[in-house]
């Protein structure tokens, strides 16, 4: 386990997030984007906002910083605002990952909340990507219910696609 492996894994995570946004979220009608779903965090919009807020919260804890303000209700339906906010959170994560060193993986930098103080950096890093995979799967199911033909998000296909690109 090393910092480069985590950077690679997060490149997969970011690529899958963008793929879902570009292929499926962008073409949704307002009604589809905000349609109430009786599962998990609700609508497609609410799932996306939850993903953004959770990633921001975890990486803020790792940095010892306060998370960004949540997306205000007045902007919660504004996809352009949400995308810009998500881009900002992703950029902060990329900056953290760029400075990540192997020895940091085995530190416990979180001060609050108390239950998170036992977590090593590597555990938080794995959790965030796993959490993203879980919610993308939920989103893909909901998008399928809305009539979209969705695609896989398996890590191994990301590897294959990037190996092929590197071999050319």
Can you say where each PLM-predicted feature lies in the sequence?
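Short, contiguous alpha-helical
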Residues: 7-26, 30-72, 113-168
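Helix-adjacent hinge/juxtasegments
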Residues: 64-103
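Short alpha-helical interface patches
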Residues: 78-88, 104-105, 121-127, 158-162
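Acidic catalytic patch
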Residues: 98-114
């Amino acid at each position: 386990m090393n910092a480069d492996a985590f950077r690679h894994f997060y490149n997969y995570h970011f690529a899958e997030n963008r793929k879902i946004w570009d292929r499926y979220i962008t073409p949704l009608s307002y009604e589809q984007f905000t349609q109430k779903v009786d599962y998990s965090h609700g609508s497609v919009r609410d799932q996306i906002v939850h993903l953004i807020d959770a990633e921001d919260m975890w990486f803020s804890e790792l940095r010892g910083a306060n998370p960004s303000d949540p997306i205000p209700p007045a902007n919660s339906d504004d996809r352009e605002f949400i995308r810009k906010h998500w881009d900002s959170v992703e950029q902060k994560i990329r900056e953290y990952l760029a400075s990540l060193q192997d020895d940091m993986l085995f530190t416990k930098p979180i001060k609050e909340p108390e239950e998170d103080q036992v977590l090593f950096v590597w555990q938080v890093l794995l959790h965030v990507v796993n959490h993203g995979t879980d919610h993308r799967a939920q989103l893909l199911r909901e998008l399928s219910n809305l009539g979209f033909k969705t695609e896989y998000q398996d890590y191994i296909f990301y590897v294959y696609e990037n190996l092929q690109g590197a071999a050319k």
